[in-house]
Amino acid sequence: MLTLPFDESVVMPESQMCRKFSRECEDQKQIKKPESFSKQIVLRGKSIKRAPGEETEKEEEEEDREEEDENGLPRRRGLRKKKTTKLRLERVKFRRQEANARERNRMHGLNDALDNLRKVVPCYSKTQKLSKIETLRLAKNYIWALSEILRIGKRPDLLTFVQNLCKGLSQPTTNLVAGCLQLNARSFLMGQGGEAAHHTRSPYSTFYPPYHSPELTTPPGHGTLDNSKSMKPYNYCSAYESFYESTSPECASPQFEGPLSPPPINYNGIFSLKQEETLDYGKNYNYGMHYCAVPPRGPLGQGAMFRLPTDSHFPYDLHLRSQSLTMQDELNAVFHN
């Protein structure tokens, strides 16, 4: 029996043919791939309609992406800084001009509306112009005040109306509103929470209540003092009058009837009213100025004298002294009769 050695060329001749055919097919596919890809791009470009501005931008992006490196390798895809061309610069400049024109027209319309609002709001001045925020705040307060009038159905007090009108406004704007309504700005002082403190003698405000001191009344058991010579409660506004030699614009100071007018007081600070000590004080006068309301144990005689501890009776370190001999004589005559 003859035996033949195993030979691949003889036994498997078809395998080599299959290998050659498969290699040829792969080469043909590699050649056909770029052609089909280019055809697809052309077909898509024909089927899709693009705007002229978008076409230029997308074409530039595709060109940038399709560019190759120096080594022939494709570059990485992604956003990169675009090349500055004349068309692109003109396009950017035109867009910027349109945006500026829109903003300018918007600001002109806003300023015109604010000017019309300033004419309606109760605040007019030829020299001073309200700011935008102050105009809006005043308009809001004005609308709210008018709505309150309609809700209540009654005519409000002028001072209350102005206080509601000036809530949250600055001091210059408050002065303008008060001047427009012919009202003194000192008559209302706006607080932090919108509350006002009244310090005026106008018909729209309330007066200060007088300071009643029980120590200044007539001592019990001494009813010989005439009612015409009795002293009224002391008001601290007299310190303002004695210092400035004029009547205080903020409050009314009561006066003592008859010869018992309050002696002048020296003003040495905002919260302290002290007398000026002199070397001759006590030498020219036999009797002191300070009297108390405590009744003595014995009968009231000519030699009796009352001394008043002023620190316990008058707050803010207030002391009174006489500056004229006639005033001292009249006071002594009243208290020793």
Swiss-Prot record:
Record-linked Gene3D superfamilies: Helix-loop-helix DNA-binding domain
Parts of the chain that traverse the membrane: none
Domain of life: Eukaryota
GO CC annotations on file: chromatin; nucleus
A Pfam family this chain is assigned to: HLH
Localisation per UniProt entry: Nucleus
One GO process term, biological-process aspect: positive regulation of transcription by RNA polymerase II
Ranges spanned by the short sequence motif Nuclear localization signal, renumbered to the chain: 80-86
Leader peptide range in chain numbering: none
Region (Disordered): 43-82
Transcription keyword on record: yes
Keywords linked to the UniProt accession: Activator, Developmental protein, Differentiation, DNA-binding, Neurogenesis, Nucleus, Transcription, Transcription regulation
Protein name: Neurogenic differentiation factor 6
Organism: Homo sapiens
